[in-house]
């Protein structure tokens, strides 16, 4: 058993149903502080339900969810306010700081972190998809957040932009470490980002394989660790012999 002081999130024998539909079955897991845990599995297996349970948006039908730290969620489609500028959207995540000079300093630091200097007064519709997701990420990092729950945050972007966003996320985490639970259908993304991958079964979801990716980030997509992780995920999902 891991030291409880090092665990940010955990499920203890969690099951969840929507009416007669059993989505999760007796699921137990732990997320370590500072870890990037990636969830992959068949469509509709309950990955987003797991994030909603971890965030506290829903309560489990059975079992216990434990949380230590402040949680922010990043979704597939950014939740930026279209009537606010980049700077104003980021400032919305800083309200907990209270002190205006401190907020201004933190906002400036975050804009520099996501490499959007000069775009502070632009509105979301004036930005590319990748730029909007960077603003969304900055807002999630703002304030006192310790944990990021990321629900397919790059899936709506084109392939080249997804690759760039993965590298951006790795760079940002080196400067601002966070605990991350990341849901994706993209096995390449999972192998490139994860410290640990949980491969989930079809509904009701159980953990059918746990994979540790013991290679520093950023990772070469043609490197042995990434290729072997991708191959194992494909086999577990029944997509490769």
Identify the meaning behind each predicted range.
Residues 38, 135-140, 144:
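ABC ATPase nucleotide-binding domain "signature" region
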Residues 40-42:
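The feature captures the beta-strand-to-loop junction immediately N-terminal to the Walker
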Residues 55:
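Helix-to-loop junction immediately C-terminal to a conserved catalytic motif
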Residues 84-91:
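Short coil-to-helix segment of the ABC ATPase nucleotide-binding domain corresponding to the Q-loop/switch region
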Residues 101-119, 171:
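Conserved ABC ATPase "signature" region
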Residues 122-125, 143:
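Conserved signature/switch motifs of ABC ATPase nucleotide-binding domains
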Residues 148-151:
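Catalytic Walker B motif of ABC-type/P-loop ATPase nucleotide-binding domains
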């Amino acid at each position: 058993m891991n030291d409880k002081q090092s665990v940010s999130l955990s499920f203890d024998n969690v099951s969840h149903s929507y009416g007669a539909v059993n989505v999760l079955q007796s699921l137990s897991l732990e997320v370590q502080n500072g870890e990037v845990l990636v969830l992959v599995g068949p469509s509709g297996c309950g990955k987003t339900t797991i994030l909603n349970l971890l965030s506290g948006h829903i309560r489990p039908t059975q079992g216990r969810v434990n949380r230590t730290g402040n949680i922010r969620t990043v979704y597939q489609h950014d939740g930026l306010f279209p009537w606010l500028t980049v700077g104003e959207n980021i400032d919305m995540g800083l309200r907990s700081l209270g002190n205006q000079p401190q907020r201004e300093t933190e906002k400036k630091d975050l804009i520099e972190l996501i490499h959007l200097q000069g775009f502070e007064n632009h509105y979301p519709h004036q930005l590319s998809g990748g730029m909007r997701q960077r603003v969304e990420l900055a807002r999630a990092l703002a304030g006192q957040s310790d944990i990021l729950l990321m629900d397919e945050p790059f899936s709506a972007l084109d392939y080249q932009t997804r690759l760039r966003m993965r590298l951006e996320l790795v760079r940002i985490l080196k400067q601002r470490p966070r605990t991350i639970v990341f849901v994706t259908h993209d096995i390449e993304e999972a192998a490139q980002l994860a410290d640990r991958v949980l491969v989930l079964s079809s509904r009701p979801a159980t953990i059918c394989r746990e994979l540790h990716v013991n290679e520093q980030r950023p990772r070469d997509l043609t490197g042995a660790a990434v290729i072997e992780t991708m191959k194992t995920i494909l086999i577990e999902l029944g997509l490769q012999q």
